[in-house]
Regions:
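Short beta-strand->alpha-helix junction loop in the catalytic core
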Residues: 150, 180-181, 197-218, 291
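Conserved acidic donor-binding segment of nucleotide-sugar-dependent glycosyltransferases
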Residues: 365-376, 383-388
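An aromatic- and histidine-rich active-site surface loop
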Residues: 95-104, 118-138
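A short, active-site helix/loop in glycosyltransferases that binds the activated sugar's phosphate group
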Residues: 128-129, 170-198, 207
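A conserved mid-protein helix/loop that constitutes part of the nucleotide-sugar donor-binding site
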Residues: 15-22, 233-261, 291-297
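Short hydrophobic beta-strand element within catalytic cores of glycosyltransferases
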Residues: 350-353
Length: 444
């Protein structure tokens, strides 16, 4: 039986979008009907998302969600009240009205058709989690992804995630992108009163191997080539310029290493232990953009690193930089399972990454060196690796990684029983879902 998968993803150009595209590419269209819900007005207003949209595989069917959902006044009141006070409502009548609104929207989009699986791939907006969960109330298996350490995301950036957490009990699977991340989120969200129990699953990100390897063969940007010509060692990092990506600490680490270099150039040394830490003529290329770009530029100037740290901006093809650098550094304060780390290991680039659950697992599967997140810790890890490069290099079997990740993904979004019965022609009718609205109070 060819199974129908219904996804929603925002297609913001980041690691989540890269992993999503790789997953779609890996799904065999002879086995799966792959469908993606989009909002046309959102795409029209965001050219960067349009670029991701154009990269969708040809076998993906696009379903538009036009206009606004029809609603009754008391239903809309419940939806608005939940947005303001997600932990306050536990009555059956409240949740009956809430779900009536979203179930009607599922029928507006797909009519009476019910997909085998409905997946909210982003996992950050309660509106989309609610819509996906509403298909579950009609018979779909439903999933919501976790791409990061959600307690950190909630405390540091997105207080509205409390609404998403409250809705976890209304999907069948909460899918973290690594086993370690699943353990972290299960434990930390329990401290917030969110019980995930057996609902918490994991499935690692996939990688578009061909795109990475072919992309790395293209010419590198002139600014990166100039940086390599002027420095003995060139580092790179990739990611949006935001607090949790911790690029500021990496920039300060480069300053520390170059300060040592300057001290050495003026001092011939006397062979004592204090002179043993030889300085490095080191440069850094940062790929990405974001709200902290101005702050990072100012920090580069204040540290006297103009000409040594180059901001390359958002790149459609960052792989010549990633493959051409001596070392990829991922200094994040919290992460899920970063696609950039997979890409670096696929290209054979040496890796230093902060000691976080997702990073730790990937380095165990492949190679690399873990570090702390302070400028001093990062500088020490960089110096160790550049003086002994083999410590951060190794072999990563990306084909095996992708095969295992796809199996885990299908197991999570379809359910192990459905996956193991893939070859059967006749399936029992979709199971009826009992209302779980009353359970909201148990996890609030």
């Amino acid at each position: 039986k060819r199974r129908t998968l219904l996804f929603h993803a925002s297609m913001i150009p980041n690691g989540i979008a890269s992993a999503f595209l790789a997953l779609l590419e890996a799904l065999d269209p002879s086995l799966y009907s792959v469908n993606l819900i989009v909002e046309p007005f959102v795409l029209r207003g965001n050219k960067d998302r349009q670029e991701i949209f154009r990269r969708l595989p040809r076998h993906v069917h696009v379903i538009c969600k036009p206009g606004a959902a029809p609603w009754r006044i008391h239903e809309r009141s419940c939806v608005n009240n939940f947005a303001r006070h997600p932990d306050a409502y536990t009555s059956q009548s409240f949740w009956d009205a809430y779900w009536a609104y979203y179930e009607r929207e599922t029928r507006r989009i797909l009519g009476d058709f019910v997909p085998d699986a409905a997946i909210e791939y982003d996992g950050y907006a309660e509106t989309w989690v609610s819509l996906i969960a509403a298909w579950g109330r009609r018979g779909s298996r439903t999933s919501c992804y976790q791409h990061n350490q959600m307690d950190n995301e909630y405390r540091d950036k997105y207080p509205n995630l409390r609404r998403v957490f409250t809705l976890y009990s209304d999907v069948d699977a909460v899918v973290a992108v690594s086993p370690g991340l699943a353990r972290h989120n299960r434990t930390r969200l329990a401290e917030l009163g969110i019980g995930l129990s057996l609902r918490q699953l994991s499935a690692r990100n996939l990688l578009d191997i061909e795109r990475v390897r072919l992309g790395a063969q293209a010419p590198a940007p002139d600014a990166f080539t100039a940086l390599k010509d002027e420095h003995d060692f060139v580092l790179t990092t990739m990611g949006r310029m935001s607090m949790e990506k911790n690029q500021a600490a990496l920039i300060e680490a480069v300053a520390l290493l170059r300060e040592q270099d300057g001290a050495r150039s003026d001092d011939p040394g006397d062979g004592t232990e204090d002179d043993s830490a030889q300085g490095l003529n080191i440069g850094l290329a940062i790929v990405g953009s974001g709200v902290l770009e101005g702050t990072l530029r100012a920090r580069i100037d204040s540290l006297g690193l103009a000409g040594h740290v180059t901001l390359l901006g958002q790149m459609d093809n960052p792989f010549p930089v990633l493959g051409g650098a001596d070392l990829f550094v991922l200094p994040s304060l919290h992460e899920g399972q970063p696609v950039t780390l997979l890409e670096a290991m696929t290209l054979g680039t040496a890796v230093v990454a902060s000691d976080l659950p997702g990073n730790r697992e990937l380095i165990t599967l492949g190679y690399g060196v873990l570090s702390g997140t302070s400028p001093q810790d990062i500088a020490q890890a960089i110096r160790t690796v550049l003086t002994d490069p083999f410590r951060a290099r190794g072999i990563f079997d990306v084909q095996e990684h992708n095969a295992r990740s796809l199996r885990d993904t299908l197991d999570a979004v379809l359910g192990s029983e459905a996956l193991h019965q893939q070859s059967k022609e006749d399936e029992a009718s979709p199971r009826s879902r009992c209302s779980r609205a009353a359970s909201q109070g148990a996890i609030a």
